[in-house]
Curated annotation (Swiss-Prot):
Binds 1 FMN per monomer. Belongs to the WrbA family. Signal peptide: none annotated. Its EC number is 1.6.5.2. This is NAD(P)H dehydrogenase (quinone). Substrate binds at W99. Residues 4-190 form the Flavodoxin-like domain. Gene3D superfamilies: 3.40.50.360. The keyword Flavoprotein applies. InterPro entries: Flavodoxin/NO_synth, Flavoprotein-like_sf, Flavoprotein_WrbA-like, FMN_Rdtase-like_dom, NQO. GO terms for molecular function: flavin adenine dinucleotide binding; FMN binding; NAD binding; NADH:ubiquinone reductase (non-electrogenic) activity; NADP binding; NADPH dehydrogenase (quinone) activity. GO terms for cellular component: membrane.
Length: 199
């Protein structure tokens, strides 16, 4: 059984929605077991709620130590000024012990993201890759492997590096059908690669 983890941070629910679609796609691959988890929220709960954060998220909270249990990890990261959120950065900064043991070396990794008005979505994905490369993970982008990537009839997310969604400046825009289709493709593609590599 190939084990895939969809690991995310989501403040307003956009990445949570994308994570569910990523998982749907991964579950389409035979012999793959998919788990969705989130990183711990580091904001004070009262401040998080006051900022409009989505406090009800069904995914359990992950610990860095359990990353070794998976063959592939698909990271969901909101964009903050062209980088991952501090919550995801804090989580990954706790994986130094895993790095020292080479515990994630050779595991599959992929990244999807959200952003307000499009600024930094690609940079967020590629800057996240840097950390994953230090672990020796095998990074799987999505290229232009799905027809939705060529649909430019309206403004929306989607990059060859990974699925993205545009949340709008106030966060009111939710992932649309095209963005979710790209997310499902990413999940299926990564799970397929992971299953092939596991043999």
């Amino acid at each position: 059984m190939t084990k895939v983890l969809v690991l995310y941070h989501s403040m307003y629910g956009h990445i949570e929605t994308m994570a569910n679609s990523i998982a749907e796609g991964a579950r389409e691959v035979s012999g793959v077991e998919v788990t969705i988890k989130r990183v711990p929220e580091t904001m004070d709960p009262a401040r998080f709620a006051a900022a409009g954060g989505k406090t009800e998220q069904s995914a359990p909270v992950a610990t860095p130590a359990e990353l070794v249990d998976y063959d592939a990890i698909i990271f969901g990261v909101p964009t903050r000024f062209g980088n991952m959120t501090a919550q995801m950065r804090n989580f990954l900064d706790q994986t130094g012990g895993l790095w020292a043991k080479g515990a994630l070396f050779g595991k599959i990794a992929s990244v999807f993201a959200s952003t307000g008005v499009g600024g930094g979505q690609e940079m967020t994905i590629t800057s996240t890759w840097t950390t994953l490369a230090h672990h020796g993970m095998v990074i799987v982008p999505i290229g232009y492997g799905t027809a939705e990537m060529f649909d430019i009839s309206h403004v929306g997310g989607g990059t060859p590096y990974g699925a993205t969604t545009l949340a709008g400046g106030d966060g009111s825009r939710q992932p649309d059908a095209r963005e979710l289709a790209i997310a499902r493709f990413q999940g299926k593609h990564v799970a397929t690669v992971a299953a092939k590599m596991k043999g």
